[in-house]
Structures are given as C-alpha cells and as structure tokens.
Amino acid sequence: MAAKDVKFGNDARVKMLRGVNVLADAVKVTLGPKGRNVVLDKSFGAPTITKDGVSVAREIELEDKFENMGAQMVKEVASKANDAAGDGTTTATVLAQSIITEGLKAVAAGMNPMDLKRGIDKAVIAAVEELKKQSVPCSDFKAIAQVGTISANSDETVGKLIAEAMEKVGKEGVITVEEGTGLQDELDVVEGMQFDRGYLSPYFINKPETGSIELESPFILLADKKISNIREMLPVLEAVAKAGKPLLIIAEDVEGEALATLVVNTMRGIVKVAAVKAPGFGDRRKAMLQDIATLTAGTVISEEIGLELEKATLEDLGQAKRVVINKDTTIIIDGVGDEVAIQGRVTQIRQQIEDATSDYDKEKLQERVAKLAGGVAVIKVGAATEVEMKEKKARVEDALHATRAAVEEGVVAGGGVALIRAAASISVSGLKGDNEDQNVGIKVALRAMESPLRQIVINAGEEASVIANTVKAGEGSYGYNAYTEEYGDMIAMGILDPTKVTRSALQYAASIAGLMITTECMVTDLPKGDAPDLGAGGMGGMGGMGGMM
C-alpha cells in the first residue's frame, strides 16, 4: 500500500479552499447575460469555447492533490445541479464558494463546525420554503420562451424555438437537439409514431426520388416472432390482396424465403408490402409492439398469448392513415386506435416512469409516452463553424432542461433576486438556531444568497455593493437587469429563473459546503519518488569465489 500524506486542521482547510477558489473563479466568469466565455484546450481538434458552467468545471484538475480535492468537491456541486435541473450550475458553484469561504472564516475564529453546518441547513430549508411561496406557474408560450431565452444566455431565437417545440408536441413530448447543416436554427416536428428501424429490403421502395416507401391507408401486421416461412403468412396476404390495401409487417425479423417471396410479389404488383424489424430489444420490444397495437387498433400476434400467424385475420391487423419508411426510420401517421385506449396506455407508462429507478429507463419510457401522445420535435442548431456549433448546441440543451424545470415547478424572479427576497424574509421572520454558533451558520447562508446577484453585476462591469443594496431596498420581483443596465420588475421584463433550478443550486451548494466546513483531516497518496537503481553492480563480489577451488 502506498504511503500517505496527511494534513490536519487549518493546514488542510487552507489547501482545500485554494482548490475551491481556482475552480469557482473559472466557472463564475460565465454567470449572467454579460458573462464571459471560457476557452478549453482539447488534446485533439480545435479548442472548445463555452459559457456553460458545468463544462468548465469538468475540465479542471489541479496538480496539488489537496487543492484538487477541494476543486473536485465543488465540481460535484455543479454536476449534481446539472443532473437535477439541467441548469444553475454556475449559480450553485458561486453559492458553494461563498458558503465555504465564510464558513471556514468562522471555523478559524473558533466556531463549532457542526453547529455552523446545522445553522446553514436550517437557513436553506427556510429559503426553499420561501422560494416555493414566490414561485408562479409557467405554462403559457411567452413565459416558456422567456425562460428558454434567459437560460440560453439571452438568445431570443432559442427561447422561441423551445416554446414552439413544446407547443407542438406538448410539455411531455420528446424534444431533441441536433447539429444542423445550415446557418439558421430550425425546428422539425415529426407527427405520429417514429421508431429507428428502416426497411428490410430496398426492393420495397416505391418513391425512388426520395429513396423511401409510402403506404396509404395500410393494414399493419404486428408479430412478436421471426418470420422465415411464407406459408404462415399466406392467409393474411390473400385477405389483404382481396381488400386491395397495402400491408406493413412489423416483426422481430423477416428473413429467407418469406422476405424473398414478399419482395417478388411487391415487384410484380400482386400485393403492396413493406417489412421492418420491430423497435427495441427483449421486453422493451414487446412493450413497444403493444404501443403500436394500441395506436393502430391492432393485435400483437404472439405465441405467448396463444395467437398464431396462420390463424390471423384482417380483424387482428392495425390500420393507419399513412406510413413512411426510409433506410433508418419508420413513421406511422394517424393510427386508427381508440383515443380512450391510447390515453389508458399513456397513463400506464407514466406510472412506470414514476416507479423507474434508472435515468435511462425513465428516458426510454418518456419517449414512448411522447410517441403515443403526439410526436417528436427536433431542434436543429445552425452555426457558421464547428466550434460555434458545439457551444450553441450545449446552450440550447441547457435551455431545454431549464424550460422543462420551469414547467414542472414554476418560475421565480431571475437575476439573483429570488434568493435575495428569500434571505430578507428569513431575516424578518427572525430564524434562530439553538446556540450562537448556529446563528452564525444562518448568517453565512443568508450572506451567500446575495452572491449570485453580486457576481452577475461584477460580470456586467458594475459596482456590486451599490446595486445589491438598491435591490435589497426594493420589494417583490424588483431587481437589476444587467443586460439593459436598468432596474425594474424582473418578471415583467421577462427575466425568470425556474424555481427548481434555483432550489437545486442552493440545496446542493449547501450540502457540499457543509461537508467541507466540517472537514478536519485530508489524506492523499504521497507522490512516488524515483525508483531505486537496481543495477547489477553487486555481482562483483563473486570474484572471491575463486578461493573455492
């Protein structure tokens, strides 16, 4: 086991604070509408330019191991805030730095660290309640666009695109962000159910100019099995041919003789058929086939429930107004499924989302809800260069997360005003701890709540103390707009922060800061020295062996 370097008390805390400050100082320059960019060097390719706090935090590793421990703990604050609300990473870092700095000063002055932490926790619990009281619902187009704009660093185009996307696919809908091909940002909405499976044979293509298959009012056969024998399908194919409609086959796979026969019949014009693989794998595939069945009023032909392909009739087939299939995707538009049955299926999946533990499962279930309930929106980000494209895409993703958070828990006045009002309410209510050290902890937390506003003002090149005092003297959502450099009602000016983002930033900052204030010892590996020289010089002693003769 490697030897360890151990530091105690103030020595440990000073080193840790130095690391905290390096990381926080790098991150906080990005805060606010006039925040600056940070350039990140990459081992290959062009440097990345970003205003995203968590991207900056993730890049920072310090040489000194004790300082690095401090930096990594604050990195955790940014990362947790990002995971919870998708935004507020810089605010969380600024709050953590302030609480840690003030808290360690109090520890150095002889306060009890555990009581300080308890005081900080009390203040944060009270502040979260105040934020909930201030919160107003965010449901209309204008408010959603404003939240998106603020989170995308005052880019109005992005705010409007996100609001449009939410309007078209619903607040539960799937909205994805992709790199576009032009200079302009674009919004593509795919109505109906889309899944990532393309045609099984290019010979099914009936629109050569677009390389796609279009089926008007097709029957849809859903089979939870591999189809390799055409005999199984003959009864269904004959019934479909008599009905004079096209047929889409969605199965685990269609192969060999079955696929060849379908291709030949399609090319001869006997029956119009297309085949695709079912989406997903294992249990997820079964569930998604059932989703398609609900959407198209069909039945999944599965031997598990005693249904056989040979006995399938037209009543077992689903129907839709139109189906479009290309090399990679299939879109089913306007399935004829019963609205009540579809809503029941959506409710069932939403219950599964609540019960799901992994983020991956939740995301996949959310996608299924969106596909059943309305569609998928894709925001295509446009930019002149790849460097700008990457930076902008990260901003749009942040804005999208923030907007979802706003719809979920409502919004509060932005620009750091909500935290200042929360701190003022706590001061007026006279929140007290069990002893004097806890009271100091409460004051540390309340003072930290001013730090986001101060940092926004500093980044705008103004005098922080003057503006902070003016805002504190106001009431409600009265604050300072750093973008236009004027005072006014923040909500009326459209400067809004999602309640969830502000709440998460404060809670995670206080959590990690509390742990750091109560740190008394730090242990790390000693740097490995040069390995001793194990040369063969010692063999010279063998010269004396001549006397053995």
Swiss-Prot record:
SUPFAM superfamilies in alphabetical order: GroEL apical domain-like, GroEL equatorial domain-like, GroEL-intermediate domain like
Name of the top EC class for this enzyme: isomerase
Taxonomy, superkingdom: Bacteria
Cellular component annotations (GO), alphabetically ordered: cytoplasm
Catalytic activity: ATP + H2O + a folded polypeptide = ADP + phosphate + an unfolded polypeptide
Residues engaged in binding ATP: 30-33, 51, 87-91, 415, 497
One matching Pfam family: Cpn60_TCP1
Keywords attached to this entry: ATP-binding, Chaperone, Cytoplasm, Isomerase, Nucleotide-binding
Enzyme Commission no: 5.6.1.7
Subcellular localization: Cytoplasm
Assembly: Forms a cylinder of 14 subunits composed of two heptameric rings stacked back-to-back. Interacts with the co-chaperonin GroES.
Function: Together with its co-chaperonin GroES, plays an essential role in assisting protein folding. The GroEL-GroES system forms a nano-cage that allows encapsulation of the non-native substrate proteins and provides a physical environment optimized to promote and accelerate protein folding.
Name assigned to this protein: Chaperonin GroEL
Organism of derivation: Pectobacterium atrosepticum (strain SCRI 1043 / ATCC BAA-672) (Erwinia carotovora subsp. atroseptica)
